[in-house]
């Protein structure tokens, strides 16, 4: 990893702060796929699945429940135990996060909110280099805790581990389709796949562009790009820091791995450890070479400022730095809070905002699967208390019918 300091380091941060997802070049190609599926339904979906997902010509798009159950039965006992533990921790955290219905009454006015689950969601589980069974847990469990009744999972050529996890969670609808075509099917529906209210889950650039295109007709959580890891430390353990950077770098050659520090000695040690730990891991090596950097700040305040400007997906900090972090998808505190723990089993979600989106939202949560509906009930006493203010404001805005709708009520009250 390169070590950068002074104005050059500030320049790197400035460039990172203005980063965004490079999606425009793919848009025409992805739009054709989305339009094909929207127009031709299963015929287009199966054509793309045959070409890109390895689907057999007569293989059903929907995975039978028996196939998922068989995958669970065949799973190694140790992996079953690990999946159960991870699912339990994720579910518990989701229960803590769940927004509540409430009502407050004062002066004849009762106000509150209703929390209602979405009726249907699509959970996308990417294929690619690794079978991301953890993404199935992270997308399905919060939807279940929220109370979503119709949960549809889509994944290209799903491996046995993913099908097994789906069986463990009680998933009933699982479709072996992926890419932009899967997003289009979930958003608009086909003969085999009913449309959903919202689509969540990460994917490759084609999936991300497809989510962007369908977002005018179907809700999405956000557009997720390549993974990002930042570590902010001045006295930490070099091997631990390097291990976190390499762990996230192995996801993708485009993954971002940044270490922020004021210590040149620690910078050199982390660089050496990262080189050592990335040996034999070509993806991590390429990622660290292309998008990895160690930035040496002039002060702790500057390092904190840089962290917030980058607004990363993951960031590891010392306890004393936590109060100063305002923009991040997920924060890991202390030497033993490995970022991989959050990727799998500690409980918080690993579907997190990238490309600077952490400036305005957090990661996937139960709140993404519910609607908060406000409720208000006014007695005649309550209406009288606010009627003058409402009439005055309505008149000021030039909306006399608004004012009259108040007046006709309190005159009879």
What are these regions (language model features)?
Residues 300, 305-413:
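C-terminal core of ALDH-fold dehydrogenases
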Residues 1-8, 173-178, 294-299:
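Short acidic-hydrophobic, aromatic-tinged amphipathic segments that line or gate anion-handling sites
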Residues 170-256:
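Conserved NAD(P)+-binding/catalytic subdomain of aldehyde/semialdehyde dehydrogenases
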Residues 104-165:
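Conserved small-residue-rich beta-alpha loop and adjacent elements
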Residues 247, 251, 259-328:
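A glycine- and small/hydrophobic-rich beta-loop-beta segment
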Residues 1-119:
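N-terminal Rossmann-like NAD(P)+-binding subdomain of aldehyde/semialdehyde dehydrogenases
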Residues 138-149, 167-169, 187-193, 211-213, ...:
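Alpha-helix C-terminal capping segments
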